[in-house]
């Protein structure tokens, strides 16, 4: 038997057996390793997946660097050191499932960040129940459309989340800007689908006109107040013109003045071929004017008589009638007017009696201002008849010519610039145009101006009348002498033409 000391010393000197790992201890070590890896949120997981899927070849310097970068991005997404093979397969299947969802469902399901395929399927089923579209569960890209179910589908390669929808704190890690997804068609160009599309387009074109008519009928009409100023009725335009005339101070007392405005301009150039609307003296005056124009060429001044014949005092017409005829050359008696009809039915003897009445103010009213002749070298000037509107208005009111048809109503239209009065509104409008620089025709005998060439021709016939009185019978029988002879046979003085100017006295010429 060994001593006690030796017995206690032997175990102390013997080497201790090595500690072998037990199965329980190994499992504890494996359970402690995942706890050291930080947990990642679903948003971070989706962001790492997008970085791997959206990586492009141009971001690396070469093919080897590209492969190394892809390995690194794939490890950041799948994390093989922290997940098992089953977990990594779950991520790949989930990605494929979310990529083939319909467009109307996929953004909402991806925004929920499903962690497993079962959770993603339950989200799609719940959304289909809410939208009441059971056809969505068939997995058709267009929902419950039966037309698209016959086609061949392609995998959608766009990212599952748009950059604006991915709200992750790891976006600021400098991974680079994610490009916007491009629109990729779900359906490949299948011949059957193209044929069905052509049939639908043909039906749409056939139904196009009917739909267009319905749209036009249902479209509200434009309010009329937008374009009513551009499309006024003629009656409204006439009413506006009438109001303007009233604002200017014109008195439209004649009911037929508006209808005569259009016809009086035509009467200036168109005369009655039969001469029924003109007096006999007017027709004789035309023949006398022709003889005057043939005898005296243009530019030659007719000689004025130095002494007035004794018969001129009786043949002198009223001065008011002369001025009225010169200012209104286009006026002719209207056959529809009862007063004009009465004047046409008057006999020549009645007109001669009117002409024979002496004008009380003839001596003073007919003395006009002197206008110098531009070709006179010694300053001599021929006497002209004054064309001022005041003297014309006074003479028209004093002379018996104011009793003629058309003048019995007075002269309500007066010019605001010169005060000259007119019986017709159209004559006043023509007179207004003369103040605006309208061309005037001047008589070379007395230098009196007229607005119309016809009025100048009528005025030149009066000078021919005066010339025939001065020459007497030296030049043979003239139209004026024949008129005088015809008047003598009728029992009265020779008929004078309205608008004739008497010769001036000799002392006025000096």
From Swiss-Prot:
Query: Residue ranges under compositional bias (Polar residues)?
Result: 344-356
The record's subcellular location field reads: Nucleus
Q: Where is the SCAN box domain?
A: 49-131
Q: Where are the zinc fingers (C2H2-type)?
A: 413-435, 441-463
Region named Disordered = 1-40, 172-191, 201-231, 263-413, 461-510
The superkingdom of the source organism is Eukaryota
Composition bias of kind Basic and acidic residues appears in: 214-231, 263-273
GO MF term list = DNA-binding transcription factor activity, RNA polymerase II-specific; RNA polymerase II cis-regulatory region sequence-specific DNA binding; zinc ion binding
Keyword match Thylakoid: no
What is a biological process (GO) this protein takes part in? regulation of transcription by RNA polymerase II
Q: Where would you say this protein principally sits, based on its record?
A: nucleus
Q: Which UniProt keywords apply?
A: DNA-binding, Metal-binding, Nucleus, Repeat, Transcription, Transcription regulation, Zinc, Zinc-finger
Write out the biased-composition intervals (Low complexity).
288-299, 491-501
One GO CC term, this protein: nucleus
Q: Pfam families from the xrefs?
A: SCAN
Question: Matching PANTHER family, A to Z?
Answer: PROTEIN ZBED8-RELATED, ZINC FINGER AND SCAN DOMAIN CONTAINING 18
The UniProt similarity line reads: Belongs to the krueppel C2H2-type zinc-finger protein family.
- Protein name in the entry: Zinc finger and SCAN domain-containing protein 18
Q: Which organism is it from?
A: Homo sapiens
What gene is this protein a product of? ZSCAN18
């Amino acid at each position: 038997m060994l001593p006690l000391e030796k017995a206690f010393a032997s175990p102390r000197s013997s080497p201790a057996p090595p500690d072998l790992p037990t199965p329980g201890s190994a499992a504890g070590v494996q359970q402690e390793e995942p706890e050291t890896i930080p947990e990642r949120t679903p948003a971070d997981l989706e962001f790492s997946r997008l970085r791997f899927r959206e990586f492009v070849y141009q971001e690396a310097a070469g093919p080897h660097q590209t492969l190394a970068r892809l390995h690194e991005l794939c490890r950041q997404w799948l994390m093989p050191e922290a997940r098992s093979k089953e977990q990594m397969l779950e991520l790949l299947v989930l990605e494929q499932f979310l990529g083939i969802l319909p467009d109307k469902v996929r953004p909402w399901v991806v925004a929920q960040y499903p962690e497993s395929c079962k959770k993603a399927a339950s989200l799609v089923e719940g959304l289909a129940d809410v939208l009441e579209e059971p056809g969505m569960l068939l997995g058709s890209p267009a929902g419950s459309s039966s037309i698209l179910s016959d086609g061949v589908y392609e995998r959608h390669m766009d990212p599952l989340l748009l950059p604006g929808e991915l709200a992750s704190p790891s976006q600021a890690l400098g991974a680079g800007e994610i490009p916007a997804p491009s629109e990729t068609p779900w359906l490949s160009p299948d011949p059957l689908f193209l044929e069905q599309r052509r049939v639908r387009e043909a039906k749409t074109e056939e139904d196009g006109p009917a739909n267009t008519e319905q749209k036009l009928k249902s479209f509200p009409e434009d309010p009329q107040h937008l374009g009513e100023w551009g499309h006024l009725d003629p009656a409204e335009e006439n009413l506006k013109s009438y109001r303007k005339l009233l604002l200017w101070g014109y008195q439209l007392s004649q009911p037929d003045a508006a209808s005569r405005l259009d016809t009086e301009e035509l009467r200036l150039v168109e005369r009655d071929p039969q001469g029924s609307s003109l007096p006999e003296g007017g027709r004789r005056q035309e023949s006398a004017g022709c003889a005057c124009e043939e005898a005296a060429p243009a530019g030659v001044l007719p000689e004025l008589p130095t002494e007035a014949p004794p018969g001129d005092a009786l043949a002198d017409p009223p001065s008011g009638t002369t001025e009225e005829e010169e200012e209104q050359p286009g006026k002719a008696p209207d056959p529809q007017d009862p007063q004009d009809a009465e004047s046409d039915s008057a006999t020549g003897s009645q007109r001669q009696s009117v002409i024979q009445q002496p004008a009380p103010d003839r001596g003073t009213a007919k003395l006009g201002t002197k206008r110098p002749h531009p070709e006179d070298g010694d300053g001599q000037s021929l006497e002209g008849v004054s064309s001022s509107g005041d003297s014309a208005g006074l003479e028209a009111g004093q002379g018996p010519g104011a009793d003629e048809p058309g003048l019995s109503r007075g002269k309500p239209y007066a010019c605001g610039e010169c005060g000259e009065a007119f019986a017709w509104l159209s004559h006043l409008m023509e007179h207004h145009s003369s103040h605006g620089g309208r061309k005037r025709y001047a008589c070379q005998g007395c230098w009196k101006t007229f607005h119309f060439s016809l009025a100048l021709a009528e005025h030149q016939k009066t000078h021919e009348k005066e010339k025939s009185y001065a020459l007497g019978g030296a030049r043979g029988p003239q139209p004026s002498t024949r008129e005088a002879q015809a008047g003598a046979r009728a029992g009265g003085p020779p008929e004078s033409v309205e608008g004739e100017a008497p010769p001036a006295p000799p002392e006025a010429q000096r």
